[in-house]
């Protein structure tokens, strides 16, 4: 069984992609809606909340947990992998993965574990736009990881303030205005140059990807995290089959929330129309 943890609803876009890609795999999703949003919280609190969510999923029987949230990934993944799990014997054989790594791998076409800069020759001075939340942009996780692999790539990062709230609130008009503004800002920062690729660095953004596409030059490749994460997990499970678990029982998809299940279910169906009803933790 594989777990997916998010501070709210955005991770449902990842869960939907995973369920489509792995129809024989069981998943448990946990949304920490009692504490959303994470972006305004201190870093240590984000780490603590993420660790608590991961523990809950481990206790539910998950051996592998994906953090379906860029803020949690940026703030907590390395701490959990390097400092927490190695010192918790009860969680031996379990692992936590973030969603920044597969996104950067796909956008730069380089493996995550690099010690020296590596990049295809035709990417030497490519222009990449990154759209994400303010907290993710401020963490510099995308800038640092992309520049480590492709130091000559030109990067334009734009924080999409208020977009997550507009999406979760179902305010399409507000979301459209924000997206139009951030795309205009990115193109202005690039001097009007067409980007070679665009990263949507928030799991809420795939459901408004068409809005981004409408305000960017035609044909620009947009990296949306759900499919990228599904591709990466497919590769990971081939290399680490023990985390896939047994497939001799019917696959189950369970969704949990620390908030109000009825309210979260209604809101969640804007992200994934077929999401099961949420249950309280």
Describe the residue ranges of each PLM region:
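Non-catalytic structural scaffold of enzyme domains
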Residues: 1-281
